[in-house]
Amino acid sequence: MKVYEGKLNAEGLKFGIVVGRFNEFIVSKLLSGALDCLKRHGAEEDNIDITWVPGAFEIPMISKKMAFSRKYDAVICLGAVIRGSTPHFDYVSSEVSKGVAHVSLESDIPVIFSVLTTDNIEQAIERAGTKSGNKGYDGAMAAIEMANLIRELE
């Protein structure tokens, strides 16, 4: 029996990161977490490209451009959508998650969804490096593992 499991080694891998600028005080912490993870696992700064977009809604389009460029072993999507008093949250969070999943499936490149979708600012802060860890770090870890797994399966 052969078991496939992606290694947690980023040496030689190239990563694209798409960052939604809206709620930047939260998203900047997600980006720091992602970069920390990639570097700790052997990624070189020259193998990491960061692209800023206005907000989470724009993430799928740029993640598609990055994934289909074939320059990256994985693309990491970072953003923060925080519920307000209108249905805007539901539209944005739903479309971003669907869009990112679609890009990953169509491109055959791991496109990792690390966009926070929280009910309030406190939950976002908790997931950006305090009580609940850092979802940017977690997303980078998933990107490393999936990039290696794809290589293993090819």
UniProtKB/Swiss-Prot annotation:
Q: Where does 5-amino-6-(D-ribitylamino)uracil bind?
A: F22, A56, F57, E58, A80, V81, I82, F113
Q: What are the alphabetically sorted keywords of the record? A: Riboflavin biosynthesis, Transferase
Residues at which (2S)-2-hydroxy-3-oxobutyl phosphate binds: S85, T86, R127
Annotated SUPFAM superfamilies: Lumazine synthase
- Write down a Pfam family by its short name: DMRL_synthase
Catalytic reaction annotation: (2S)-2-hydroxy-3-oxobutyl phosphate + 5-amino-6-(D-ribitylamino)uracil = 6,7-dimethyl-8-(1-D-ribityl)lumazine + phosphate + 2 H2O + H(+)
Q: Which cysteines are joined by disulfide bonds?
A: none
Presence of the UniProt keyword Transmembrane in the record:
no
User: What is the stated purpose of this protein?
Assistant: Catalyzes the formation of 6,7-dimethyl-8-ribityllumazine by condensation of 5-amino-6-(D-ribitylamino)uracil with 3,4-dihydroxy-2-butanone 4-phosphate. This is the penultimate step in the biosynthesis of riboflavin.
Spell out the protein name for this chain: 6,7-dimethyl-8-ribityllumazine synthase
User: What organism does the record attribute this protein to?
Assistant: Clostridium kluyveri (strain ATCC 8527 / DSM 555 / NBRC 12016 / NCIMB 10680 / K1)
